[in-house]
């Protein structure tokens, strides 16, 4: 299988999906202990890098997505599809899996 190159800036999610760059997980505890990868929790916060056009309604119109590119969001722990591109971690979420925006 040939590897393909995807430019994140040209990626456009479909429907009400949101593409999020995952924030880095904590490298050490509050007490200063370094955590191995196996002990790190999956981050649940990230920055929106692309947004779909919104969910299509029965009449054919679209419901706008409530978040925009650049928003920091908190999302469900087991939500979405994890994607790794150019060494960075991303998650493709449905809008309903986003719990809150972070100021």
Curated annotation (Swiss-Prot):
Family matches, as Pfam families: Cpn10 (PF00166)
Keyword Heme: no
Cross-referenced PROSITE patterns: CHAPERONINS_CPN10
SUPFAM superfamilies cross-referenced by the UniProt entry: GroES-like (SSF50129)
UniProt keyword Chaperone, yes or no: yes
GO cellular component, as recorded: cytoplasm
Chief place of localization: cytoplasm
Assigned keywords, A-Z: Chaperone, Cytoplasm
Disulfide bonds: none
Location of the protein in the cell: Cytoplasm
Domain of life of the native organism: Bacteria
GO term, biological process aspect, one: chaperone cofactor-dependent protein refolding
GO-annotated molecular function: ATP binding; metal ion binding; protein folding chaperone; protein-folding chaperone binding; unfolded protein binding
Subunit organization: Heptamer of 7 subunits arranged in a ring. Interacts with the chaperonin GroEL.
Function: Together with the chaperonin GroEL, plays an essential role in assisting protein folding. The GroEL-GroES system forms a nano-cage that allows encapsulation of the non-native substrate proteins and provides a physical environment optimized to promote and accelerate protein folding. GroES binds to the apical surface of the GroEL ring, thereby capping the opening of the GroEL channel.
Family: Belongs to the GroES chaperonin family.
PANTHER family: 10 KDA HEAT SHOCK PROTEIN, CO-CHAPERONIN GROES
Protein name: Co-chaperonin GroES
Protein species of origin: Picosynechococcus sp. (strain ATCC 27264 / PCC 7002 / PR-6)
């Amino acid at each position: 299988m040939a590897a393909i190159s995807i430019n994140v800036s040209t990626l456009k999610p479909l429907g009400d999906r949101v593409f999020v760059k995952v924030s880095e997980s904590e490298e050490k505890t509050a007490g200063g202990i370094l955590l191995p990868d196996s002990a790190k929790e999956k981050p649940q916060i990230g920055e929106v890098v692309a947004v779909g056009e919104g969910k299509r309604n029965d009449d054919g119109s679209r419901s706008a997505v409530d978040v925009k590119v650049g928003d920091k969001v908190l999302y469900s722990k087991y939500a979405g599809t994890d994607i790794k591109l150019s060494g960075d971690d991303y998650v493709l979420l449905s809008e309903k899996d986003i719990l809150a925006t972070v100021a």
